Amino acid sequence: MLRNLILITLLVASGHGQTPVIGGTCKLGTADVQIGGKQTQFFLKCETTADSAEGEGVWVVKSRAAAAPSSVPSVPAENTQPQQHPKARKPASPNICEQDNGARESEVCAVSATCLQAHNDFPSSYLQCDQTTLRWVRKSCQENFLFNFEQQTCIVPKRMSSLSPSTSSPSNTENPCSKCPLGSACRNGNCIPLTTSNLCSDGSPPNNTCTRDPYSCPKGHFCTAQKVCCPSTALQSSIGCSTVCTIDESCPKGMTCQNNCCEERKLLRHPKVYRYATVEATNTIFEVDNDIFDSAAIESLPTQKPQRLDEIMAPGITPTPTRTTEPPKLRCLSSNTDEVNSLGGASSSSATCGGTNANCTSDEDCPTTFKCYQGCCKLAVCPRSLTAVKFTCKTQYHCRANEHCFFGGCCPKTIELAVIKSQVLTMSKDNEHTKETEKLIIGDCEVDTRVKKCDIDIICPEMSECVDGICCKQPPKARCGNGLMALSIPVHCSLSDDCPIASRCEYGKCCPFLSESADSTSDSVGETTPVIIKEEIISTATKVWKKVDKTSGVSINKNKCLSTQRCDLHTLCPPDFTCSLSGKCCKLNIHCPDGTVPETSCQSASNHDHCPSSSHKCTLLNKEHFACCYSPGLVVEGSVTAEVSSECPIGSVEVDPRFGTSCRYSLQCPSPYFCNQRGQQASGLVCTFSSCSNSNPCSVGTCNNGYCCSSGSNSGSAIIDSDTNSTTNPSQPETTKTKNNTKKSNSSKKHRKPKKKDVDPLSDPLLQNDFPIGPPGYGFPEHLSNLDEVLIRAQGDGVSCAGGFQSSLICSVGSECPAGLHCDTAINLCCPLLLPLTDPKNPKKRKTKRRKQKQDENEMEASANFPDSDPARFSSYSCGCMGGGSSNCVGCQNAPQIITIPQNSCPGGGYSVGGCSSGYCATGYSCIQNQCCPSYNSAPRISVYTCPSGGNAVGACMSGRCASGYTCSNNVCCPQTTTTNPFVCPDGTQAAGGCVNGQCGTGYTCSNGLCCAGTSTTVKCLDGSDAVGACIPSCTGDGCGGVQVSYYCGSGYTCTTGNICCPINSCPNGGEVLGPTINGLCPTGYTVQGNLCCSATCTDGSTGLPSVNGVCIDGYSLTNGVCCPASVTCTDEISIGPCTGTGFNGGCPAGYACDSNQVNCCPVVRYTDESCQVGPAIDGLCPPGYVVVYIPNSPLITNGVNPGTCIDLQCTTGLCLTANQIGDCDTATDAGTCPTGYTCFTNAGICCSTTTFSRLRIGNSRQMAQKPNYGRPLHSYMPPRFGGPSSSCSDGSLSSGPCMNGLCGIGLECQNGKCCSPSSNKPAGLLQSKCPSGDTAVSGCFPNGSCGTGYECVSSLNLCCPPGQPQTFPSFPGNNNGFNINNNNRFGSLSMSPRPIGARCQLDGECVGQAEGLSMCHAGVCQCSPIAYTQGIACVRRKSFQMNDDPVIDAANDDKSSSSVSV
């Protein structure tokens, strides 16, 4: 209704100033005008604006709290602006925006979160009140858009002056026609309409023209290239933007508008472009026809030798450059005589100003950072670098290397340039083509032939430097050896451990690995690489590049060894390093015959004690060095000249490991892949989790180690008959018979466990290290190391595996198989390791004395018939044939088998655990058809995560990455889709809001239920990004009770104008945005704010220290999320002198610091601590490492003279530990200089080690008070928690365990290195709305029931949630179940129905069978505990079986010789 009233008002209103029109001019003091009669609470009020003339204002819509009549229903308050709030979420109280002229960025805000304020300095930006920090946050409009407060949106600047910040307008005496209307300027005493090109750079109208007299501009104004007077405030801008602009015409001459900033047109003469530029853009630079200077030759430019400036700008000037020097006479100016006359008609000095277009008589006439020099404004201080200009210039070639010509001055370059892969250029002249492809090398200098001779006037191109008049190319620091660009973070590196994962350190830069090879060690040994360049660290500050012959000696260089890494047989070195005999990890230039790097060094070929396993042999490599290489029976003498190709098993493929470039154990590989013994990886598995898992079992048989096996083809009974005797296969060779047969038969009463030494080690080289002990990613827990003593490698029948299993996994080279499998050499297939089992329900009968005598007689008879054969026994050793229940082998006993799972006998696919007892079963089971089956309160349903596109996930993400064609979503890999938002306005602007009765405000039309500009149908944020949905109100309907309604959004989104949820793209606590976090981490100097890396700066501009769990060290306080030095104050009596504020430590000695007022030097040492005092000072001097402090009322005062007390500098507040110190700082610079890896602590003048992010080195992990308790599945092999307060989440709840590479399981988030539920990661008091799946909703649904891209609307909750939400049922009065089909009762009752195995969970109590200790919730999924195994969707307690390696056991020794094990 309000919109209709406003629309009628606008239609009736005429152009006269007396008729009130929204946005029209008015006289201040005019009475308010009621809108729609007296029954409404809206009226028009005349208020002043930034650009209103004196005594004038603009009509603005206002609202008054009017009581609704009793007979007429109240009309809900609506926003009269074009962007309307959806009617369903309209607040009960009016929401009229009022302008706050005092709003400033990063200051406290106390207005409605949905009202935006104009930025006082940048018309193309606006301020928004952040809901979390309650501070103003700066946002940016789209390109070529300006913010309009009245409309609360970014619009195309039709009347730009109304949107500009307030400027100082001259009085009538300075400008006779200052009363010209908007959009016009005074010229020759007349008001002339101006075009867009005549406006100032900030969009404001010029004050006057300066066509004939350049000095006619009033004070505080300057003459632009368009010959108009613009205010000096139009040149003010933030760091990083020289001049704010909207279109090219608003920039000074010679500049273009790029991203709302005026930038200089640069002449690129070398094959280098800005980072991320395209190769095509670089190629166009060399096309003469398309030269940006219209084919102007460099030789035609006037040359002038550099000259020094006589005056240097004062330190107080702020660097804000505005215009770029344009080389004069680039084009023929004879045809444009007006421009020539305008440039030089005033005086001879005006022509010499060149492209600056600014004449002056004093420094006040010039912009900031400029000085008046010979009648022209010249640059005095370079921008960003804050360095004084030393040389003037007119072209790029007048400046030195790493400088560019900027406003007529040579300034250091601050834009990082990247070298594009060089190409051979063909130079043409008179149809004669000459190609220069040969390199000219003089000594160690590779000559850059583009410049014949270099000097101060003729400089070398980029990436080259002048040496004795010759341009020598610099080493390729920015480009890696594999052709990829170096990483920008970190800036420098000394070792590869300083670089992120999947990268290494080259020439002080971190270089990423290629996908097909990790580093130079993976290259073929046979490849000929005669010369390589390596870096040799000769000091802490300089590096030299030295040419080394790759085929030279292999002696260990101490510079290649890790200084802090120690190694032994139990603690191996990182990949690509070899453990030396001295216990250091060194990088050697040798490789094993299979191409891998040796694990350890050894002494001689006959001594293998230093090798990590029996599969490694000490081998002589390159006739000089002994090292342990994996190759059974290998004897190599001499140098290695070829590489043996390492292949995965037939039919398998290689994938990248979870971290690093090569694997050592299978835990380094993503499941279900395994690592073969040659350092490569292979799959070869028949199925993956999507085709064979606990929640999706094989159609026939069982799922073992990730592949489907048959369980009924060749198997006999499910349980092995313990009374059946086994005999040796007569077809076996006689060489397999042991010498202890007779001894064993005579001493059959004594039982012993089998020993590995009884088995020929040469028959199976993989008999050991199936389950090696090691840290996460390199081994298994210690309690699993004895599986080799329990499991047996049973041989099959020559056709299939033992126990009736079918396998299609072919053994790899060297008879290798994944952990838990062994290679059946008869069929060359990988078969499962088995347990010898007997059923406790059918135990082996005790043999009486008569039965024992009969048994001995049978054995003696068999021994007489076959004197050399083994006695009949049930042994855990391999049987020569596998006949099962129908074996055709004569005299061959059934080999050990595993239990065959029976067919499903319970409803829902479950399995029976036994028969009922008088119609009753144990807790958690019910009697169905005389069988005990798992019982459920509701129909079980396995929850399978669906991707945003609706498809199923293919597996979990590995370090946030997925295979090609898949993307990581919620820590699972989903197929990549190209979906678009169906709600897109044609012009790409943001929708103003929802339509009300199918109508919108002026300038907007209703399209698809939304108000869009013109015929727009999109929902976009002010920065151009897509909105995910509408803001969620804190209450709706009668639940509000007259309370002010607030709006909020999900994590990572904020509620903006129009009540829509937009992504957060700024730092909530202030600071500049660097980019998104990498594995939850940020580089040094930046802090994590949300999911962004923000600059960690203190209020004084200094870089703060990162806090630890929100706590700072002594002497520091938490400010803007970082630790900043606390304020220092002291009296004049204890201060040591005035603080200059310049030089090292502000001019104060070590142990002192400038106070908060920058007046006195106050002590920062703990001088009151007697342990820090060493004694009185002698003549004001103290020993090295101590500082004198004149403590008031000191007992050392004699005759009124205070000699001073010497205080230890180690007592300085905030100083690092002594173990992290390296010495004193070099005080030559203000910040102090320290060796690489150390930072100067200026208050004490001591160098402390720098805190940087680095990879965890093996063997150097933090020492814990006790060994971790490993009790989770192997692929989640991490300690569950370390205990103490550190294991708690932010809300006090216990974490699920530590994060791995910043990642957690499905349904969890990484918080301070701990995996916590998403709800525990939200600030206290923040409203949250939960989706049926438990995820936090990102926003509310749009009025038409839709959401943004990647989300779907849950109509019953009116929330935008991730796709694949389970169906929900509303809770009715009296219904205490709150039932939904996914057993998720968060929105219903407090009762909790058990969830099946494989379903998502948050607590152990949610899983079925948890009360009996059979299940647990791990990584957000219900899993069986170690004492149980999975049957369908439930857990069944493992049975206890007796394991007998010798069936001939006397009854008296049964209790001592049997052992129990759970399977």
From Swiss-Prot:
Signal peptide interval: 1-17
Pfam families assigned to the protein according to its UniProt record, in alphabetical order: CC
Record field: compositional bias (Polar residues): 722-734
Biased composition (Basic residues): 740-756, 843-853
Residue segments, region Disordered: 70-99, 720-773, 841-869
Chitin-binding type-2 domain boundaries: 94-164
Annotated GO CC locations: extracellular region
Keywords, alphabetical: Chitin-binding, Disulfide bond, Signal
Cysteines engaged in disulfide bonds, as pairs: C141-C154
GO molecular function per UniProt: chitin binding
TM region(s), chain numbering: none
Keyword Disulfide bond: yes
Protein name: Chitin binding domain (ChtBD2) containing chtb-1
Organism in which the protein naturally occurs: Caenorhabditis elegans
Lineage of origin: Eukaryota, Metazoa, Ecdysozoa, Nematoda, Chromadorea
